Amino acid sequence: MKKIFTLFGGLVLFFILVNDNLFNNNILNLIERNYYKNNNENYHIVSNVEALNSNKYFKENLSDYVSITNNFYPKNKKELLNVYYTVLNNGWDKFSYYCDKSYTNCLKDIESLSNDNKELSFVNQLLNPYNSFSSIISNYNTDGRIDIEVKRKYTNKEIKKIDNELNNIINKLNINNIDSLKEKIRVFHDYIATINVYDSDKENGKSNYNSDKAIGTLFEGHSICSGYTDTLSLFLDKINLKNYKIANDEHTWNVVLINGDWYHIDLTWDDPITNTGENIIQYNYFLITTPELESKNEIEHNYSKEIYNFIK
């Protein structure tokens, strides 16, 4: 994790929040500079969340960690985090809000959200991958308005390409003709494991692949955990199963709700790197229960019960 801090004289605070993979390359760039009103023409300022439409990738939230809000005058950090979650989950690219006059630590808390990369990165896991962010720019104007601009992880062109490919795979694997939900998932699980290898070079910055995204998983044959989980999450959405991504400092995997029960899937660990280079598929982390996962007692699969309190 790296943090860059720059400060110039001027009128406006300019925060950049960056999310990459999990929490490894978050950057804070705090700049004071002039900020002209004509830059704000495309920003939404509303008093009620229903005044703006959600995009089609809005995801129901079951976590108590954050919630959709129609209060865009936050008075504390919890309410501030809810504003960011609401903007992200609704798919809004630009948005404006005001901190309540009593909220004297507002700017410090915005900076804190930038420094504490986990908070907004955890929010990303509760979103549809298409609504997740790669960076968030927050501009503070001297009239007290904070303008948010979101750079999404996936471009519209990539979304269209991924959606088409997932539909092609579903047809090729005859997923819709399989009765069992677990079997549908297994067939897709095996297909993705077969066409991919783990991109070990991504961690040292030498990779030439988009392995942290579904683009790398579906088209380049190289993935890391975020690429596997995004791809599986999008597939589970396609077959209308409620699902989320789970993350900690080191790793991310999927959970899916089937017939009222939550099951964990770690496609990354089911597609292991072998000494011989042989491509093998395992099922050690395929649709296992929370007690089964916890019985393995692995640090890489620890997760916050506060954030994922809905998983039993």
Residue spans for each PLM region:
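Sec-dependent N-terminal signal peptides of Gram-positive bacterial secreted proteins and lipoproteins
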Residues: 2-22
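Mature secreted bioactive peptide module from preproproteins
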Residues: 116-123, 129, 145-147, 201, ...
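Secondary-structure transition/turn motif
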Residues: 149-156, 258, 268
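Secondary-structure boundary elements
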Residues: 155-217
